[in-house]
Amino acid sequence: MALASGPAMRALAGSARLGLGGYGAPKRGAYEWGVRSTRKPEPRPLDRVYEIPGLEPITYEGKKHFVPWLAKPIFPPWERGWIDPRFHRAAPIHEQPLYKEQPCYIFHQRCRLLEGMKQALWLTKTKLIEGLPKKVLSLVDDPTNHIENQEQRVLDIISHSRLWHSTEDIPKRETYCPLIVDNLLQLCKSQIIKHPSLARRTSAQNCSLATTWNRESLLLQVRGTSSTMLSAKDPLPPIASREEVEATRSHVLETFYPISPTIDLQECHVYEVKEDTGFREGYPYPHPHTLYILEKANLRPQRFLPEQLRAKMLLFAFANALAQARLLYGNTARVLEQPIVVQSVGTDGRVFQFLVLQLNTTDLTSSEGVKNLVWTDSDQLLYQHFWCRPVIKKKVVVEPVGPVDFQPETFKKFLALYLHGAV
């Protein structure tokens, strides 16, 4: 191994004195390598104009160019003279024309109530009854209301919605959920030959809705659009008798203290108190019959739980009934002589929720007195699972393509709610 010569050793030693570590490499400490090398430069100090009482600052506004020893002028905000939606600036909340001191708690399409049905019952002053009304169940059990070759036609609808309609291998929920409801409604409409009074109905989509009411010291509002609403020329007949309605006076609404009843509702100070049924005056089908609320979110975190979906169904059915009651009987809070009945069906394309609401009173401020009534039939499976591809094990088809564990009773209830009021 050759030894370094004298001049070479002196050069290496000289590099050490220069801070190169003795071998030509830069010498830095850990602090210099770690923090200082990644630290961003300090931001430029803000241009500040110091206002001294009695003295006017001398700026370079009249010079039309920057002068370093003169103060920076303060220019008024530039006005375009026209509204550009890309750069629109809303006025402060307290300066807007619809601003009000009293907050309004709003329920809309994407509100998910923490307490679910229990919270919705308190907000709407409603008594819950499990199961569908006897009048509706009698339509379910009556074989004369069944459709010819009913089960096979429902199976074809499921296969069409989940498999045949889409070009995807596995269609998403937002694709098959609305399709299966529309096809089931189309199948129900085939009964118009047997029951001509079904011709006095029509369906509408994306109907706007807004209604406001006071509950104790709270101002509540439901507003939004409904997926599909079936409306009719004639209202649904009352379900509960006058004696059953008067018996609700003794019912005590369940509370959920210490949780606030307005939790998960949107608190808003800019709002408009109005009643909107979604239909113009003179519309030939003014009475709401059935709301079809779809849960078609693909991502699981965005989906409603079954309890939250039933609460949403109750609030939107209640809002439609309340808006209709005020349209017919005025805004005076009182017990209705002719209760208003509105139905609702909620589904994710597989599990169905059925609900029937009877609005008995518009006096909702106090928890005493007559209560409204709601009947629910929860978590009714139309089918357990749908195989979009066959399951093959050892070259044997274990599970063929199609629905698994089909429940025909669920469609019978769906059909009974559709026929209610026409049979």
UniProtKB/Swiss-Prot annotation:
Organism listed in the record: Rattus norvegicus (Rat)
Domain of life: Eukaryota
Transit peptide endpoints, chain numbering: 1-29
Keyword Nucleotide-binding: no
GO CC, any one term: mitochondrial large ribosomal subunit
The protein's name: Large ribosomal subunit protein mL37
Family: Belongs to the mitochondrion-specific ribosomal protein mL37 family.
Subcellular location as annotated: Mitochondrion
Primary location recorded for the protein, binned into one broad class: mitochondrion
Assembly with partners or alone: Component of the mitochondrial ribosome large subunit (39S) which comprises a 16S rRNA and about 50 distinct proteins.
